[in-house]
UniProtKB/Swiss-Prot annotation:
Inducing factors: Expressed in the late phase of the viral replicative cycle.
Protein name: Uncharacterized protein F165R
Transmembrane segments: 16-36
Keywords in alphabetical order: Host membrane, Late protein, Membrane, Transmembrane, Transmembrane helix
GO CC aspect terms: host cell membrane; membrane
Cell compartments where the protein resides: Host membrane
Membrane topology, as annotated: Single-pass membrane protein
Keyword ATP-binding: no
Sequence similarity: Belongs to the asfivirus F165R family.
Predominant place of localization: host cell
Native source species: African swine fever virus (isolate Pig/Kenya/KEN-50/1950)
UniProt keyword annotation of Disulfide bond present: no
Amino acid sequence: MANPSKRIMNKKSKQASISSILNFFSFYIMEYFVAVDNETPLGVFTSMEQCEETMKQYPGLHYVVFKYTCPADAENTDVVYLIPSLTLHTPMFVDHCPNRTKQARHVLKKINLVFEEESIETWKVSVNTVFPHVHNRLSAPKLSIDEANEAVEKFLIQAGRLMSL
């Protein structure tokens, strides 16, 4: 676990990281996302503005589940991604299309200013227990809203187990 004294948690860095995440996702067509607060779905939203407002309003926000289609990759079907709230010192995961590698790495670096040295690999292992095909763009999962909620619940259980080890 990273040293809490090394955390960069001031308002400017958190806002910069939120902006970086939203700028990254603006490359894609967002279909919906589900925000989860303390393991309870807050609702389904359809705009970047709602996403940003939700992140600001809920300091205890755990995870946000995005479902969108990437127009830059014709092979890519609807994909579900998980990213954490910036207020939690937890691992994080952001996947991306092959031709968006530079932008994705930039976002990962920005988020790591907040999350520091948490293991991205550990996060990927835990995500794969919920979304076994998330890295395979030809068989990416297509989830309904209910299925997304269920996947989040399963993910939170798996993430809790990993973090308690």
